[in-house]
Structures are given as C-alpha cells and as structure tokens.
Amino acid sequence: MDSYIRQYIQSQRAPEVTITWQGGEPTLMGLDFFRKSVEYAEKYKKPGMAIQYTMQTNGTLLDHNWCNFFRENNVLIGLSLDGPKRMHDAYRVDKGGNPTFDKVMRGLHLLQDHGVKFNILACVHAANASYPLEVYRFFRDTIGAEFIQFIPIVERDNETGFQEGNEVTERSVGPEQYGGFLISIFNEWVRHDVGRVYVQIFDTSLAAWVGEPSSLCIFSPTCGNALALEHNGDLYSCDHFVEPRFLLGNINERPLVDLITTDKQRRFGLDKLNTLPMYCRECTVRFACQGGCPKNRFIETPGGEPGLNYLCAGYKVFFQYIDKPMATMASLLRHNRAPAEIMQILSTEDKYKAY
C-alpha cells in the first residue's frame, strides 16, 4: 500500500488527485487499512496538492466508526443498491444466501445521519430491468439520491469467470431491455429532474452532443486508463479484465509509471478503436457510443463482423431516441442558458400535443 500510494502520487502532475477504493467489498479490509491509506496519502502528497477519496461499497458493514471516518476525510461513497427490496434482494445476497437490502438501507441511513455524500450505483439486470420508473423513483423519492449510475449486467456464461464466450447468464440484462429501461427513465428525468438529479449516462450523453470528450472510458474512442491494482501489488490493464493475460506486472517489482506506459497497455487501449467493426464506424450514433466497453464486444454485426457490443441494439435505440432533446440542451448550453430549460420547452410541447 505504501509503495502504490507513493508511486501513484509521485506520478501525478494535476493539482487534485483521486484515490478510489473498490473491490470485491473494500470494507472487508477493515477500517485501519483505510486510515493507513489516508496517512500515506497525506505523507506523500505534493505541496498544494489536494487528495480526494472515493469508495464503492455495498454498505452492509457500515457503522458509526466507518461513517465518522468518511465524514472526517470527505470520502465520497458509491453505494451499491439495485432498487426496491424485491429487486435488490434477487441477486444481492450474502455468502449464506441471505438478502442484504435491509443491511444496505441501514448503512444508507447511517451515511445520511453523518452527512456523508453518496452516489447510487445500480446494476440493471433481469430482476429490475422491466421496472425502470419504479427503480428511478425509489432512488429519487424514497432515498433522496441526487447522483445515480446505472450499470448494465452483462455476465458471460462460462466456468472461468473471464471475458470468454458469447453466451450470457440468465440474470444478464437484454440489449433491447436495457435500451427501453434507459428511455423510460430519460422521459421522466428530462421533464422533471434536469439539474436536480444527475444520471451519469445522461450527463455523458449531453457531453457528446456538445462535442466534448466523454468522461467515461466505455464511451471514449480508446481506453486503458482504468487500471486495476490488487492488494498484492499486481496491476491489470482494466478492472473488467483482471485475468492472467492482462497482467502488466507488480508495482513492488517494477515502477508503476513503467507498467502504465508499456507497449502492452498502449495496445490494450488502442485495440478498442482498431478493432471497431465497420458497422460501428458507419453508425449515426458512433459519436456517443464509440462501440461501448470492450468486455461486451463479443457478438457479430448483421454482416458477420466480429466485435459488436452485446448491448448495441439497446444503445442504438436509446441514443437515437434522445437525439432531439439532447440537441436542444446542447443548443441551450451554447447560448449560455441552463439545460434545465428543456423541461419548460417539453412541457409546452406536451400541452400542444394534448389538443
């Protein structure tokens, strides 16, 4: 840990550096591990450098001590929650097979009681994908979430657990199902919640319509900047590819900067662009999608090209559907007006349609 934090901070030139803890479940490492992490970060940070901390957790182990630590160190929490109880508990069970919703909600209330900032990370899967508005309204109205990420579950059906094969498990979300899920929530959000609730894929999409680079690697032309470090110092090309063939090396044996800048890692990032099928290159929504995450590019195009994203049909219908309102919000921004004005514009349009 000392070696990684020292090397990571020394390699940064930006005035603000983010240290992110995720797993597995990071809280299993115990609170002392994170206290030590902060101690090292404060020790090695450069003059004038600000350190931001984030943690992705399922929330089941949180208590007052954890929440005091988060508040004292201004840790931004990403809380894994898949919607109302019956949807969350469909797949999020503990090692004994017991449901976890009540424990997660207890953790959420502790975060709120201690004034800890949190985002919601919701997996979209077979158990909740058919109930988009119920999921969204639960987050918005019941728990008061202001920042929401939706992560589509695309899980390969194999024995290795690696990104191999072209079959998916029964709990994976369907492509068209995911597109419909996003469209239903977008219709609610764009009429009522712009500027009040931040949904990551909507914000990223707006950036694409404005012509700005995506903040998400999955919607960028190339990738390779979301490396994964294991507790033993092993560094992998991506947190979706923690597999032997994507091992770059160990930071205890070779400097972090050297591993990040290897030809192997550079090729990994460029492969996203270089292997993009012609079907995608000629697509009208390529500017917003860029082929999606490489981990999901395992089906064929209608013309038989390999490397099409499993979620293509869903992404395509979603990006096509949001084109007009996104173009309107992009125009508002270019004229130094708030994107939230779209709500009044659509309200007026909807009234005219009613007559």
In which residue ranges do the predicted regions lie?
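Radical SAM/AdoMet-radical enzyme domain recognition
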Residues: 1-20, 29-155
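Generic recognition of stable, solvent-exposed alpha-helical segments in well-folded globular domains
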Residues: 32, 65, 103-106, 130, ...
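Flexible mid-to-C-terminal extensions adjoining Fe-S/redox cofactors in radical SAM and related proteins
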Residues: 242-355
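A cytosolic small-molecule/anion-sensing beta-strand core signal
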Residues: 231
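Radical SAM enzyme [4Fe-4S]-AdoMet core and its adjacent flexible, acidic
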Residues: 2, 90-102, 109, 113-218, ...
